């Protein structure tokens, strides 16, 4: 009887996994919009030395900058980079 219950549970899991819908892929424009809204603004080297008057044109990315973005801060950090497009 226990093996019958195990078979039923396994079949139910198989049906649940097989019928799961895949999420639609986002277009490049949607990805760019979401990338630009993600993270914390940061000051690039081109924004000037004064952080209070800087326009904060960069965005902090954990790890490294994604494709299409470039590092805009001159110092090196292992944890995060200040990047802009």
Swiss-Prot record:
Q: Which GO terms of the molecular function aspect are on file? A: sodium channel regulator activity; toxin activity
Arranged from A to Z, the UniProt key words for this protein are: Cleavage on pair of basic residues, Disulfide bond, Ion channel impairing toxin, Neurotoxin, Secreted, Signal, Toxin, Voltage-gated sodium channel impairing toxin
Q: What is its main location?
A: secreted
Signal peptide per UniProt: 1-20
The organs and tissues expressing this protein are described as: Expressed in ectodermal glands and in clumps outside of the extodermal layer. Is not expressed in nematocytes. In adult female tissues, shows similar expression levels in mesenteries (gametes-producing tissue), tentacles, pharynx and physa.
Q: Which InterPro entries match?
A: Myo_ane_neurotoxin_sf (IPR023355)
Could you confirm whether the keyword Secreted appears in this record? yes
List the propeptide residues. 21-36
Q: Where in the cell is it found?
A: Secreted
Question: Which cysteines does the record link by disulfide bonds?
Answer: 42-82, 44-72, 65-83
List the Pfam families hit by this protein, alphabetically.
Toxin_4
User: A GO CC term?
Assistant: extracellular region
Q: Is the keyword ATP-binding in the record?
A: no
Question: Record's family?
Answer: Belongs to the sea anemone sodium channel inhibitory toxin family. Type II subfamily.
Quote the record's miscellaneous comment: Nv1 toxin seems to be encoded by 8 different genes. 4 of them code for identical precursors, whereas 4 others code for very similar precursors. In the genome draft, 6 additional loci are also correlated to Nv1 toxin, but they are not predicted to be functional genes. This high similarity may be explained by concerted evolution.
* Role of this protein: Binds to site 3 of voltage-gated sodium channels and inhibits the inactivation process. Is highly active on DmNav1/TipE (drosophila) and is only extremely weakly active on rat Nav1.4-beta-1/SCN4A-SCN1B, and on human Nav1.5-beta-1/SCN5A-beta-1. This reveals high specificity for arthropod over mammalian channels. In vivo, when released into the medium, this recombinant toxin induces impaired swimming, paralysis and death of the crustacean A.nauplii within several hours. Also causes paralysis of cherry shrimps immediately after injection at very low doses.
Q: What is this protein called?
A: N.vectensis toxin 1 4
Lineage of this protein's species? Answer: Eukaryota, Metazoa, Cnidaria, Anthozoa, Hexacorallia
């Amino acid at each position: 009887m226990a093996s019958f219950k195990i078979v039923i549970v396994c079949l139910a899991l198989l049906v649940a996994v097989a019928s799961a819908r895949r999420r639609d892929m986002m277009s490049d424009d949607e990805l760019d919009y979401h990338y630009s809204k993600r993270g914390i603004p940061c000051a690039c080297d081109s924004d000037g030395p004064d952080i209070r008057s800087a326009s904060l044109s960069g965005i902090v990315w954990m790890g490294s900058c994604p494709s299409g973005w470039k590092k805009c801060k001159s110092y090196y950090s292992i944890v995060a980079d200040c990047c802009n497009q």
